[in-house]
């Protein structure tokens, strides 16, 4: 039985139309599925299964975190992993706001014999921050009003790390020697005006290394703080005879001002723990008044003979910091996580230790936008592991304390980008 050419053509056309319809339907289905997946992946990055410690928001439990466009988009007990373009599994790890190191020295430069002001002893931040979980540093007075513009151009604006600073009351900054003893270069009015001009970066004022038996530098730095509405940080001591520590803490400093190197025992300064191993009563009184006691470990400013009895009597630091520079990084200090680990082993609760390097320093420098992971906050995040084992910790007198816990940085995120990843938590396997 023959089929007419016309009928054959109609059948062929009908078949082609059917195939085309099926093809279009398949394409539409694929597009719909792709669109659904894309819509489902509403977050740039998810961190799941981690134990979040966020002091500002009083969180100390397992939580998932979503990041979008460099900011915290959601913090919930459970977020569907399918909603993230990239997912980091933080099972067994501690997730924290990016650490804030409130005492560093980052005015690295090439001027000789200028100590920490545009010289070799200071360190450029990025090589020493992210690998220890730090996303924000606060330089403790390396620049003064005369060289803050240089510092801004060559350090602040060249760093991925957020760099803030205390402005030295000495116009030439922390240049060492006679330059830091020059009362004529300690101008509170000019310092306050410059701090206001550079308000995006300057968070307070610093006095350090003055060795005269004279309250004038202290009075001038506090005046600068009052004029600008900012705190001051004091590296106190060095005078002969000693200026009384009690007068500094109870009369000279204001609530919110910062006493750094809290656990030091150095010449020219009364230590906070007396000869009988007791914390001096006025030290507790000062902390209750609102004086901020900062660790500022450094290369010569933290000894166990002060820290251990003080911690045993409940005298905890308000902020934990490093005093990072070339003279401290290879000694007992090492990095901020090593310093924090010392306090964990001295029985300071982990939640308090994390707060002392995140939300508390953020408050002290009047930067309430930092140090927490609230929705809408910048996505600066640190993921650490609390290792168990046998460890040794060294002070600046080269004495050792044994411990069984130690913090290690696993991953650091700055403004939503992974900037340090020790074990490839954010990476896929090479053959996948």
Locate the predicted segments by residue.
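Sec/Tat signal peptide C-region and signal peptidase I cleavage site
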Residues: 36-40
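Histidine-rich, glycine-flanked metal-binding segment
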Residues: 42-46, 52-98
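C-terminal cap of metal-dependent C-N hydrolases
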Residues: 50, 378-430
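Divalent metal-dependent hydrolysis catalytic cores, especially in the metallo-beta-lactamase
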Residues: 124-152, 159-177, 198-213, 229-233, ...
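Histidine/acidic residue-rich metal-binding segments in metalloenzymes
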Residues: 150, 185-293, 301-318
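His/Asp/Glu-enriched, well-ordered alpha-helical/loop segment
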Residues: 305-388
């Amino acid at each position: 039985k023959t089929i007419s050419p016309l009928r054959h053509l109609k059948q062929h056309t009908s078949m082609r139309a059917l195939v085309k319809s099926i093809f279009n339907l398949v394409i539409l289905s694929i597009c719909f599925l792709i669109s659904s997946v894309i819509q489902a992946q509403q977050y740039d990055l998810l961190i799941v299964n981690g134990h979040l410690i966020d002091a500002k928001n009083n969180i100390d439990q397992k939580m998932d975190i979503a990041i979008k466009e460099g900011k915290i988009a959601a913090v919930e007990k459970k977020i569907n992993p399918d909603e993230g373009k990239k997912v980091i599994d933080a099972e067994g790890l501690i997730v924290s706001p990016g650490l804030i190191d409130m005492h560093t020295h980052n005015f690295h430069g090439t001027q000789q014999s200028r100590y920490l002001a545009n010289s070799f002893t200071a360190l450029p931040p990025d090589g020493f921050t992210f690998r220890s979980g730090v996303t924000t540093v606060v330089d403790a007075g390396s620049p003064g009003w005369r060289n803050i513009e240089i510092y801004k151009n060559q350090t602040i604006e060249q760093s991925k790390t957020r760099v803030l600073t205390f402005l030295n009351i000495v116009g030439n900054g922390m240049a060492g020697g006679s330059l830091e003893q020059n009362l004529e270069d300690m101008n509170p009015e000019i310092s306050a005006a410059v701090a206001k001009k550079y308000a995006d970066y300057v968070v307070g004022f610093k006095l350090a290394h003055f060795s005269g038996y004279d309250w004038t530098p202290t009075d001038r730095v506090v005046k600068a703080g009052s004029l600008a509405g900012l705190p001051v940080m004091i590296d106190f001591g060095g005078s002969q005879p000693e200026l009384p520590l009690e007068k500094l803490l109870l009369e000279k400093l204001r609530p919110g001002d910062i006493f750094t190197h809290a656990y030091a025992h150095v010449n020219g300064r009364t230590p906070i723990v007396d000869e009988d191993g007791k914390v001096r009563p006025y030290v507790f009184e000062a902390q209750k008044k609102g004086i901020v006691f900062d660790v500022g470990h450094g290369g010569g400013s933290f000894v166990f003979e002060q820290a251990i009895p003080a911690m045993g009597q409940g005298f905890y630091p308000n902020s934990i910091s490093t005093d990072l520079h070339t003279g401290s990084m290879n000694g007992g200090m090492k990095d901020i996580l090593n310093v924090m680990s010392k306090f964990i082993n001295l029985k300071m609760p982990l939640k308090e230790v994390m707060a002392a390097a995140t939300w508390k320093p953020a408050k002290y420098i009047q930067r309430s936008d930092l140090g927490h992971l609230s929705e809408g906050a910048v996505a600066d995040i640190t993921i650490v592991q609390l290792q168990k084992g046998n460890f040794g910790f060294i002070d600046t007198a080269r004495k050792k304390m044994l411990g069984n816990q130690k913090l290690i940085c696993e991953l650091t995120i700055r403004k939503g980008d992974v900037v340090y990843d020790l074990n490839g938590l954010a990476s896929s396997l090479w053959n996948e």
